[in-house]
Amino acid sequence: MAFWQGLINWLGYGHEGEEPVMEKPVLEAETTPVTPAKGKLVGLPTARNAMRLVIARPQSFEQAAGLAENLKNYRPLIVNVEGIPVEEARRIIDFLSGAAYALGGRVRKVTSGIFLFTTSNVDLSGDLEDQIPGGLNWLEAAGRGR
């Protein structure tokens, strides 16, 4: 029986007690510190950076340049020119219309004497002009025509 046991052990199928285990030295891997790459931050709309609408009632043409600054900063602008002289109102509307056009925006009449100026970052839907009697001739609609 010793013969068969020896053969089984020699083939590797038997248990012969514990064999001496040779320990291999453990090698430590070199580690290099990894610095995380900076990701691109994208701002999400919040209440702080929400769009602001400026409402103004200019008294003279000298205020038109200050109002155009709002358009340059991509803020929509509502201007009420009721109650000021016709020529002064016409100059203000013409100046702000040019500023809005230069910025890729639009001009919409809200009521006679009140206009909405927008820039390219504002999308308007609807057709306000169709709802206002007098069409685009706001001076005649206000009773202040030439």
Swiss-Prot record:
Function: Cell division protein that is part of the divisome complex and is recruited early to the Z-ring. Probably stimulates Z-ring formation, perhaps through the cross-linking of FtsZ protofilaments. Its function overlaps with FtsA.
Top-level taxon of origin: Bacteria
Gene Ontology CC annotations of this record: cytoplasm
Protein family per UniProt: Belongs to the SepF family.
UniProt subcellular location: Cytoplasm
Subunit and partners: Homodimer. Interacts with FtsZ.
Stated name of the protein: Cell division protein SepF
Record keywords: Cell cycle, Cell division, Cytoplasm, Septation
Gene3D superfamilies referenced in this protein's UniProt entry, alphabetically: SepF-like protein (3.30.110.150)
Gene (UniProt): sepF
One GO term (biological process): FtsZ-dependent cytokinesis
HAMAP family, per the entry: SepF
